Amino acid sequence: MFISSMNPVKKNNSGGILSRIQFPEDIRMLDIGDLTLLASDIRSAIIETVSRTGGHLASSLGTVELTLAVHKVFDTPKDRVIWDVGHQAYAHKLITGRRDVFSTLRQKGGISGFPKREESPYDVFNVGHSSTSISAASGIAEARDLKKERFKVVAIIGDGSMTAGLAFEGLNWSGDRKKDLVIILNDNEMSISPNVGALSSYLNHIMTGQTANKIRKDIRNFLKTIPSIGEQVLEFSRRAEESLKALIVPGALFEDLGFTYVGPLEGHRLDHLIRNLEDVRNMEGPVLVHVITRKGKGYKFAEAEPLRFHGICPFSPETGKPAAASESPVPPSYTQVFGNTIVKLARQNPRLVAITAAMCEGTGLNAFAEEFPERFFDVGIAEQHSVTFAAGLATEGILPVVAIYSSFLQRAYDQILHDVCLQNLPVVFALDRAGFVGEDGPTHHGLFDLSYLRSIPNMVVMAPKDENELQHMLHTAVACGKPAAVRYPRGSGVGVTMDSQPFSLELGKGEVLCEGGSLAILAVGDPVHPALTAAVQLREEGIYATVVNARFVKPLDRELLLRIVRSFKKILTVEENVLTGGFGSAILEFLEENDIHGIQVKRLGIRDEFAEQATQAEQRRLYGIDEQGIAAAVRSMMNMGRSSQMEACL
């Protein structure tokens, strides 16, 4: 839906210049003084909203001036602006028609935390994963020329995203094609000293100004008319210009790829940015603009701890501390349990190493990295490389554990298949954020891993019912000597007692948690405990369910399944994964392979659609995989019939 179809809600500001801004054409009338005040208003609105909703704060605070400069100089939405990842796009949303609904950021039915084409014509390309902007922008530029239209295409990409192979593939292609394309590299890891910044700014303004470009073009045309000597002088002048610039700015790589390099530019000086972008707008061919920004700019807590404020839960704007939580003790998160367990396993096995793709803290590997720095590898945003790197380690007897978010592992499917499983290498995949992730929405849900992993030969796929079982599954994965994946959800554990040491489970064996005679509920992973709760509710209605914790999606516990199908004619499967190709599909395939008929199977999971943003609880309720949904599905299957069988809960 376009934003105009949404109902306005309370504004984020009580006044100020932001209250007068709806669309980019409004900011094009402002002078530098007013733009500076607007930047302050925008930062206040972002901090106020994210403190309540959570979100990606530091990146968005760091790109406020850059956002204003881009929209002031370029004729958006006619000119296309593509944001990479989208973490930095909150200011963009505030000045492109979404100011009055910004308070709904990342909420159910509200605006997305990422650019979304369905939301606004200013959002040119849907994003959420990194490093896609350059390839997308090059495609848009090609389409523009095929249609013989005239508009500028601008991709804005962070320095972290530049570590991915996809970004370099896009650079290589677009530099070779020589289409009109502007890539803005938002570099928030470097700082510029005043002298270098001033000299670089002056040199770049001269080299990119319209007058300089016209003189350069006229001289080149004249020299080309002089046989032999003209071409030599032209080549010498080009090299001299590049050599002078290379002494001052780090743009040689981009120049070699076919781009005109501009920068580095100070990313928080609006006059400086606007002047240079105006020059860039009038240039032809591929241009890379290098802009230096500071993550968390304007909010002291985010400037001091940009990593903690990258993606943050609700917090107090006054103190920067997390919002007050319940005084009751909170179970450890699955991420924490993984981090603690992998350290224990590494102490026992000197061959074990850990790999992450720019998510050391997010995946819980901080303690491992500190205790075993020589056995810890952060490869940057390079998921494909991380998997094949792990495969290479495994061929030499090293035991790699790749810790990665479920949705990001999708980017390395071929590497899992071709480089790990085809060789049957013992690589362990620890898949954090499997299932619903909540407010980050469809780009970040981990709802496909059971389906795409169980389709690969040699792969073992596990999902724990709680945090204690997670540590045992990690031990199992490390010890099994095969490619193995353990997927676990975002958030806190169930609150069960933790065993002091992890141990291996029997490979491919599930467990019966609760026995009854009415029907069988086969659950895997996080839905196991809701299934148990539903069984308790149903007992009061005279429906007695057997609840099975499958543990393994691959291999299945064939012995247990044969016992189930001999005892029940009704089976309900529950998973936090898409139904297509998932755990329920594996059960149906088992029945077909064993020529078993007359069994009614109902599958609960995610329909053939992309799940939208909401809280995890809201999402589970929507798809019927919470205790109420499971109980309702059982009642439907039983037609509210009553069983005379008694239940024995273990």
UniProtKB/Swiss-Prot annotation:
The keyword Magnesium applies. CDD domains: TPP_DXS, TPP_PYR_DXS_TK_like. It catalyses: D-glyceraldehyde 3-phosphate + pyruvate + H(+) = 1-deoxy-D-xylulose 5-phosphate + CO2. Signal peptide: none annotated. GO terms for biological process: 1-deoxy-D-xylulose 5-phosphate biosynthetic process; isopentenyl diphosphate biosynthetic process, methylerythritol 4-phosphate pathway; terpenoid biosynthetic process; thiamine biosynthetic process. Thiamine diphosphate binds at H87, G128, H129, S130, G160, S161, N188, Y299, E383. Disulfide bonds: none annotated. Belongs to the transketolase family. DXPS subfamily. Catalyzes the acyloin condensation reaction between C atoms 2 and 3 of pyruvate and glyceraldehyde 3-phosphate to yield 1-deoxy-D-xylulose-5-phosphate (DXP). This is 1-deoxy-D-xylulose-5-phosphate synthase. The gene is dxs.
